[in-house]
């Protein structure tokens, strides 16, 4: 197995603002995190609000200490009006080519040296630029929890979206927009991982979120088993003949 390892942002520090009392320890933490990811292996880190908690210069110093690409498609240098980081990275793994784009909606535009472009416009520009160049497009988005429900409409041509910026976590049983893009959230500070296994059965076909359907089947199976435990030898339609609500639930399962 040779997985693609990505971070959607808010990795380096534990807060969006550093002060004298925590600056040294937080910068040490950020450097230690990068050293750890260097050993583990990481294919891209999206620049989120926490990455800029110490300012741009400390972030650039940390980024210079690693070969891991920091990406951002909507953070510009205020002096040159050019992107500070590469907007995306291309990854070829297992015969599948991925285009991974970094975006943020949480970084304050009051930070010196920084211009924050509209992440929705920047994201769609680079998604369009990748058409025909990659098999799958992946967005790493650092944004508020309130935006997650709209991301599939904002970026309809994306395949997978991984978010940071809140403690919200997706579960396999959570329903996703049919045909994608599928949105995944892993909480905060790298405490949890979202593992997505991808199999391409039909090039150009629709994307199916298999984990949701499997979780749903397992849930209904357990529910029917609980109903059957009451008297395993009696058919369910006889066992609950006088309980139409349960029969309806069994039928739905």
Predicted features along the sequence, with ranges:
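Acidic, metal/ion-coordinating pockets
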Residues: 1-253
């Amino acid at each position: 197995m040779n997985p693609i390892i990505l971070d959607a942002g808010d990795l380096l520090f534990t807060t969006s603002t550093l002060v004298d009392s925590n600056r040294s320890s937080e910068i040490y933490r950020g450097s230690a995190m990068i050293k750890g990811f260097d050993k583990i292996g990481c294919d891209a880190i999206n620049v989120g609000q926490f990455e800029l908690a110490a300012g741009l210069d400390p972030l650039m110093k940390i980024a210079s200490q690693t070969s891991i690409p920091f990406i951002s498609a909507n953070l510009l240098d205020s002096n040159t009006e050019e992107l500070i980081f590469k907007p995306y990275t291309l990854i070829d793994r297992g015969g599948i080519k991925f285009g991974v784009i970094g975006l943020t909606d949480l970084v304050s535009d009051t930070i010196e040296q920084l211009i924050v472009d509209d992440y929705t416009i920047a994201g769609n520009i680079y998604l369009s630029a990748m058409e025909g160049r990659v098999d799958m497009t992946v967005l790493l988005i650092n944004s508020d929890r309130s935006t997650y429900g709209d991301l599939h409409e904002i970026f309809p041509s994306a395949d997978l979206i991984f978010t940071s910026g809140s403690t919200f976590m997706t579960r396999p049983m959570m329903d996703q927009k049919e045909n994608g893009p599928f949105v995944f959230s892993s909480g905060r500070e790298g405490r949890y991982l979202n593992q997505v296994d991808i199999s391409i059965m039909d090039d150009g076909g629709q994307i199916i979120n298999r984990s949701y359907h499997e979780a749903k089947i397992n849930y209904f199976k357990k529910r029917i088993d609980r109903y059957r435990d009451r008297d395993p030898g009696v058919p369910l339609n006889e066992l609950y003949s006088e309980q139409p609500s349960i029969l309806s639930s069994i039928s739905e399962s």
